[in-house]
Amino acid sequence: EQRPTLVNLQCDIDHPTQIMADTAHIIKEFGGVENLKGKKIAMTWAYSPSYGKPLSVPQGAIGLFTRLGMEVVLAHPEGYEVMPEVEEIAKKQAEASGGSFRRTNDMKDAFKDADIVYPKSWAPFGAMEKRTKLYGENDHEGIKALEKVLLEENGKHKDWACTQEMMSLTKDGKALYLHCLPADITGVSCEEGEVDATVFDRYRIPLYKEASYKPYVIAAMIFLSKFKNPVETLKELERKELHIQTRFVRSRDF
């Protein structure tokens, strides 16, 4: 029976393909999933001229990294909270995995001695609830008024940026910088943004590697949904590939 596979590429709550790509990247960078236990990751809000970016990345990050025994710190200005249900899940998972989860309104506190930093903008959950309600009521004037308030509030936090000074607070000043891309780069894509150009350029190659995992994550999701015994199926495919390669080498010898 032919059955289509449904993959969640992103929703209001989570961004599973992105966060699993991030996870594959940090597993590679730190030499194995077992080496992530005890590592500190700072999932922090960062200023962007656009106030309404999705919450799915920070929520997905705290939802997955807390399962790996990591020290997860969620940092944002007051009023930029994520969904409370997601935070509760993160707390329970951190306790179960032997890691930790906490929230702070101090970006420097989050960056202090961090092994990994993930600074990006997102919209306040409470404001998005209001906006959804206004759209449902077709209240265009209410939407305009809300957007004005949100932009004014957003502009108060331009100091929440990933700068060289901020990176110097991390572990040995060499934390791994993550971003789901595209990033709002100060002086490049905007006047003031999430990250300084000097920081972004320093991590350009690792960022592209991070992004490159996503197609494989999506392919793995599809593969898992199509085969009852995915591990055995992969082993069989590997055996067949090895057999083909062996025959090819032998044919060349003749």
Model-found features: residue ranges?
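A short helix-to-beta-strand connector/capping loop
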Residues: Q2-P4, K92-R102, G173, R202-R204
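Adenosine-phosphate binding glycine-rich loop
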Residues: T170-F254
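Short beta-strands and strand-loop turn motifs
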Residues: V7-L9, K40-A46, L74-H76, K148, ...
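ADP-ribose/adenylate-binding Rossmann-like module
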Residues: A127-E191
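Glycine-rich phosphate/diphosphate-binding loop of Rossmann-like nucleotide-binding domains
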Residues: I27-K133, E137-E141
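Phosphate/diphosphate ligand-binding glycine-rich loop within oxidoreductases
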Residues: E1-K28, I185
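Short, conserved loop/helix-junction motifs that constitute active-site signature segments
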Residues: N35-K37, T66, E165-K174, D201-R202
